[in-house]
Design a protein with these regions (language model features):
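ABC ATPase NBD coupling module
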Residues: 54-69, 208-212
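A short, surface-exposed alpha-helical micro-motif characterized by mixed small hydrophobic
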Residues: 184-186
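A short, proline-enriched helix->beta-strand linker immediately N-terminal to the Walker B motif
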Residues: 137-141
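Short catalytic/signature loops enriched in Gly
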Residues: 205-253
Length: 253
C-alpha cells in the first residue's frame, strides 16, 4: 500500500506550506517521513533535501529536535506523570534554560506557574501551546506541525495558527499539516491538497478563495465547501457535483 506517492514539495524560509487532505490521505505520514519516525516496517523511496543537501539518517539525527522540530498531533506525546516545565526543558535545571522556557511561555500566553502543572491540569489550548513551546526552545529553522488544532474552537485554533505565522515571519519554514482548509488558507502562503496519497492541487493560499483558479474537481469542491458558500440555514449556495464518482474513477477508490 502506498501511503504517499509522487509527492514533490518545497518549503522556503519564512514560508508556511500547508498540506491539506482528509483522514487517510497521507498527511501525517509525510511529517513522520521527514522526521525519520516512520514505523519499522514502512518503506520510503525518494529524496529529502535540507539546505540543498540530502537529509540522510546521520544528518537527520544531528538536526532533529534542534533545527528540525515536530509539533505532534496527539497530546499523548506529553508524559502525564511529569510536570510540563521539566518536559519543555528536557530535564535541564540550568538557569539559562529555565529562563528561556519562561520567556517562551510568556510569549504564548502561558501564565507563571504553568511549568509546575501536569498535562491533565491544562486545557486543550494550553496543551497545544506547551507542545509548540517544546518545539521552539531551540529556535528551529523548519517546523513540522501535524494537525495542531484538533478539538479547539475556532478562536483558539486561530491563535495557535498565529503562533506558526509568527515563527515563519521570524524566518522559519513551517510545514502545516491539517484537514482544515479554512485555517490553512488564512494562515499559509501556499497549499498542497492530497487525496489517496497523491498531490492533486498545488496553489497559492489566496487561490483557495477563488474556485475558478483551481484545476482539480476535488480541490474545487473543497473550496465550495467553505462557510461563505453556505446559507445561515445550512443550505449550499452552489452544488459540489458528483465529486465522489469523479475521484473513484481517477483513483480507483
Amino acid at each position: 500500500v502506498h501511503g504517499v506517492k509522487d509527492l514533490n514539495l518545497t518549503i522556503h524560509e519564512g514560508e508556511i506550506a500547508a498540506v491539506v487532505g482528509s483522514s487517510g490521505s497521507g498527511k501525517s505520514l509525510l511529517a513522520h517521513a521527514v522526521m525519520g519516525i516512520l514505523p519499522y516496517n514502512a518503506f520510503m523511496d525518494g529524496t529529502i533535501r535540507y539546505d540543498g543537501e540530502i537529509l540522510d539518517k546521520k544528518r537527520l539525527k544531528a538536526l532533529r529536535g534542534h533545527e528540525l522540530v515536530l509539533v505532534p498531533q496527539s497530546v499523548s506525546y506529553l508524559d502525564p506523570l511529569m510536570k510540563v516545565g521539566k518536559q519543555v526543558t528536557k530535564g535541564s535545571r540550568k538557569l539559562e534554560t529555565v529562563l528561556k522556557m519562561r520567556q517562551v511561555f510568556s510569549r504564548y500566553g502561558l501564565e507563571p506557574g504553568t511549568e509546575e502543572k501536569y498535562p491533565f491540569e491544562l486545557s486543550g489550548g494550553m496543551t497545544r501551546r506547551i507542545l509548540i513551546s517544546t518545539a521552539v526552545m531551540e529556535r528551529p529553522r523548519l517546523v513540522l506541525a501535524d494537525e495542531p488544532t484538533p478539538g479547539l474552537h475556532m478562536e483558539a485554533a486561530r491563535r495557535v495558527m498565529g503562533h506558526f505565522r509568527e515563527l515563519a515571519d521570524e524566518g522559519a519554514g513551517v510545514l502545516l499539516i491539517t484537514h482544515d482548509l479554512e485555517l490553512a488558507r488564512e494562515t499559509a502562503d501556499k497549499i498542497t491538497v492530497l487525496y489517496g496519497g497523491r498531490t492533486i492541487e498545488e496553489a497559492a493560499a489566496e487561490d483557495f478563495y477563488h474556485e475558478e483558479r483551481l484545476s482539480h474537481p476535488y480541490a474545487r469542491a473543497l473550496c465550495r465547501s467553505m462557510p461563505e458558500n453556505w446559507t445561515p440555514d445550512g443550505e449550499r449556495l452552489c452544488d459540489t457535483g458528483d465529486i465522489l464518482t469523479q475521484m473513484r474513477e481517477e483513483f480507483g477508490r
